Amino acid sequence: MSGSNPAVSINKKKVAPVVLAILDGWGYREEIEHNAVRQASTPVIDALWHAYPHTLIEASGADVGLPDEQMGNSEVGHLTIGAGRIIQQELVRISNTVKENKLIANPALNQFSQSLKKGGGTLHIMGLCSDGGVHSHIKHLCGLIEWAASKGLKNVSLHLFTDGRDTSAKSATKYINTIEAKIKATGVGEISSLCGRYWAMDRDNRWERTSKAYELLTDPRFAISKLSAAESINKSYQEGITDEFIEPVRLSSSFLKDGDGVVFFNFRPDRARQLVKALKLKDFDGFERKNKTDIDVLTFTQYESGLPVSVAFPPEPLNDLLGQVIADHGLNQYRTAETEKYPHVTYFLNGGIEKPLKGEVRHLVPSPRVATYDLQPEMSADELTESCIQAIDTGIYSLVVINFANPDMVGHSGIMKAAIKANEKVDSCIGKLLNSIGKLGGSLLITADHGNSEMMIGPDGQPWTAHTTNPVPVILIEGEKRKLSGYGNDIKLRESGGGLADLAPTLLHLLNLPKPKAMTGKTLIEPINLPKKPNLIPQPAY
């Protein structure tokens, strides 16, 4: 899918662009062992790292508005990059509410419970059951169970999605034990179904996956297992199936019926939208719904504007973001990514705004239709690169943002050889991209939104499928037509104290645009006094 914006201005003279290349999941770790970044053959990025200004910046924890030691993620990373400031993320916002026992005072939740009690329906609580902190947190689920008990809701069914992606591949049992203990302590609720996130949380329009989760939740004929939740998980392990891929299993007679209510406690929108759309949209064409239900749905955060649901924690508006500054100065910008990361370079980078800005053109390159990306580690990087080069060659875009999904999406597989191939493909694409940028005298800023593929085996010796808290690299290749004036004869990048919030100020610096006061991040660029030399674009090695 590509889009043209009628508000895009066309200049006869070609623009030297500033290009931001986000290598999703390309973290930095010194150790070579189990490191798919260090073990990959990456001649282009290696050469750039040694020849051009570079540094490391933080992309996790407090530096991106998350709790200390909490791994970063793509949503938070792109939001922070676009905002140019540290924003308190939904994980922290909701966690504080739960910790302070303030769920009981949440207006949306209270109205929801009153309506449900009046109608006599069952409360269904669903979401990702883990402490990964990327899409949800088990403490929020525990808080909801306590909230339901405080409101006198007796009929409470839990539909839990197992993780194994942002957590260890075989960790579901400990989370189930935690929830069963909370159920016992409060006297409220039962675990009615289990389902791997692979089925319940697809975001790539693979509706055949979503339909399996939908049937589990709504089909009265769905078979009820005689096994307990823990027994079902262990049975999956015996069959070689890890948490992410656990087949849908119903554990009780409870399913969604007319008059019931659903609370979806995932706070990250992108992997929750499809299932909510299947449950609530009247005009829905993802798959044939055999068991339509008339239910109320409350989501923890706003998954998408216009969805017919209640929202417990509505978005807090952000102003003066990177894209807005570009648009306000009458400049054109181009955003592109594969399906898996398209929302991140558009919706999240723009602070949760769906509609393109004036002068903003978006281009989506379909991700390959494979079960898991280790089967095709190159993904659609070549097509993505070629489409981006075509956009750069038009000479109309001042800012270009491209996201390479490979290091993250293949890194999540936990398969070392595939992750190495993924990183090598991205390296070759950077070389091609650099040639195109250099022809116009533009600048390239290379970075990542969080770590992942630099750590493929965890401390327990098992495949590491989650993100990391490692820093990420930044490399600046300053183009001949984008040389900064008033900075001596050369530049360097700040050696320490940097974070993702500093990238937008750095990009505005390169574009010679003023930084809004709301952006508390600072440019990473610092002057040094060296003999002037041409900033030649190296030839790609591929």
Curated annotation (Swiss-Prot):
Substrates-to-products reaction catalysed: (2R)-2-phosphoglycerate = (2R)-3-phosphoglycerate
SUPFAM superfamilies found in the cross-reference section: 2,3-Bisphosphoglycerate-independent phosphoglycerate mutase, substrate-binding domain, Alkaline phosphatase-like
Pathway involvement of the protein, from the record: Carbohydrate degradation; glycolysis; pyruvate from D-glyceraldehyde 3-phosphate: step 3/5
Annotated binding of substrate, by residue: 135, 165-166, 197, 203, 268-271, 341
InterPro entries the record matches: Alkaline_phosphatase_core_sf, BPG-indep_PGM_N, Metalloenzyme, PGAM_B_sf, Pgm_bpd_ind
Keyword terms: Glycolysis, Isomerase, Manganese, Metal-binding
GO BP, sorted A to Z: glucose catabolic process; glycolytic process
Coiled coil regions in record: none
Record: residues binding Mn(2+) 2: 24, 74, 449-450
Source species, domain of life: Bacteria
Active site: 74 (phosphoserine intermediate)
CC annotations in GO: cytosol
Binding annotation for Mn(2+) 1: 408, 412, 467
GO MF entries: manganese ion binding; phosphoglycerate mutase activity
NCBIfam families linked to this entry: pgm_bpd_ind (TIGR01307)
Complex formation: Monomer.
Protein family (similarity comment): Belongs to the BPG-independent phosphoglycerate mutase family.
Biological role stated in the UniProt entry: Catalyzes the interconversion of 2-phosphoglycerate and 3-phosphoglycerate.
Protein name (Swiss-Prot/TrEMBL): 2,3-bisphosphoglycerate-independent phosphoglycerate mutase
Encoding gene, per UniProt annotation: gpmI
